[in-house]
Amino acid sequence: MDNFILIISCIVAGMVFKTTKSIHPEAHKGINTWILYIALPSISFKYIPKIEWSLQILYPAASMVVLALGAYILMQYYSKLKNYSNRSTSTLQLASGYSNTSFIGFPLISAFYGEEYLSIAIICDQAMFLTLSTLGIITALQGGNNNTISAKFLLKRLFTFPPFIGCVTALVLSSFIDLSPAEPLFNKLSGTVAPLALFSIGLQLKFNGWKKLMSQISMSMVYKLLIGPALILVLGLALGLKESLVKITVFESAMPTLVMSSVIAEQFKLNTKLTNMIIGISIIVGFFTLGIWYKVLEWCF
């Protein structure tokens, strides 16, 4: 419950500050800079050293990639039918393929299934983060003004993107150095991601013209909250995997849109208005669809 109150409080606070002009209109850019350069890399240093590498992590890790690739393909096809621009296409792909696996996911996994299953949720979260830092950035780059992107340019942007650098550095250092003494620092820094990202969304959130965007919002949420998790469930059932592994992975994939999608969209000059609307509405609708998914998963197993 605390997390849900925090979600509402931070978004509303951002909207109030924007409406009353109590903050600089470009303040969200400074906030996003902190998130990208400090807070997000700290998440990698907090969780990656704790991952136990085994065959068991393949399904939850691969599922997050499948979820993102499914959104990429479906939104590419949908946008072509609707004759959307590259910018709109990339925005939809970014807003549809990445789940809020930690800030919303962790407390809901604990509430529905118990804290002992958070180990699976953490694998989902880190796989989602790694996918966002790679495929997500490639997707965002494709929505830029340049129709063609050279491999050299793409690799340069990818390898200079702070969260990606954080992931790679954490992977390498944790193999040689015990990072546990610095864990309290990483806990505090990573803890700033959710409230600041939500506050930033509130600063940018606009509902004027939502009717014109409803078809895009609806398509994004249908995939994010229904089709995507269904794909992951079918994959798990087809492979005959352990019940708890499939349940937690599917439930994580059914979470609302990742808040960080807004920060990436702003960084690469995509349609932040559409992204923020999808995030806000998916959080509300997602609470209902997650209840449905819980019942479906109980029935399946």
Question: Positions of the model-derived regions?
Answer:
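Alpha-helical transmembrane segments of multi-pass small-molecule/ion transporters
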Residues: 1-301
